[in-house]
């Protein structure tokens, strides 16, 4: 893909880049409107998720996470931008006339063919059960529950690795560093999710962040005592505590937040690394 760099005519265009092959004209039968639920508020209007709100209007793209069109070859027709995720999506035209969106695998170009099923080649973009994959395969869009569709490793640049198969389970190393067990009958897609360098992209200005629905993050130490436990003091004052806390007084920065006695506790062999 050709990457075009912006000419530095203003500070906001400095180090900016755009992918020439990525389009933004979705099919009408694969998109639908949705209630704008990204404001970070509940039904009463109370803020439940800070630093969210505003943003450009979005249409949801219907993504095929199940990949259940078995043994039907499809061709990549377009690679498109999706405002609802960091990864790109690509439109697939299947041999039976059906059209679906899937996550764009890294390295896939327009004209490539993909297929899903039980006995398909180990090729980038193909979807098949874990039991049919060799050890060491790089995968994404991994199912946790059989038939529910991919739920793991779906973000831009995400990739997991199949490291072992024993009995009815397969052992995966996830992008977070967590090692866990999953049923061998669950399916996954071969390869890595595309748009790998999205975290290195320069937004250029604060307005670009606001278009994404993200509001400014203010440090608690510069607030007033009524607004945050770290607030108050004259000038640049320390937080006044041994350890930092959240705006509601709970320990922050290091406290484990995972619930105990969770159903998947026995399936996790090694917790994620930070």
UniProtKB/Swiss-Prot annotation:
Keywords: Chloroplast, Plastid, Ribonucleoprotein, Ribosomal protein. The keyword Aminoacyl-tRNA synthetase does not apply. Residues 224-252 are annotated as: Disordered. This is Large ribosomal subunit protein uL2cz/uL2cy. HAMAP family: Ribosomal_uL2_B. Belongs to the universal ribosomal protein uL2 family. The gene is rpl2-A. One of its GO terms (cellular component) is chloroplast. NCBIfam families: rplB_bact. GO terms for biological process: mitochondrial translation. Part of the 50S ribosomal subunit. GO terms for molecular function: rRNA binding; structural constituent of ribosome; transferase activity. Its main location: plastid. Transmembrane segments: none annotated. Pfam families: Ribosomal_L2, Ribosomal_L2_C. It is found in: Plastid, Chloroplast.
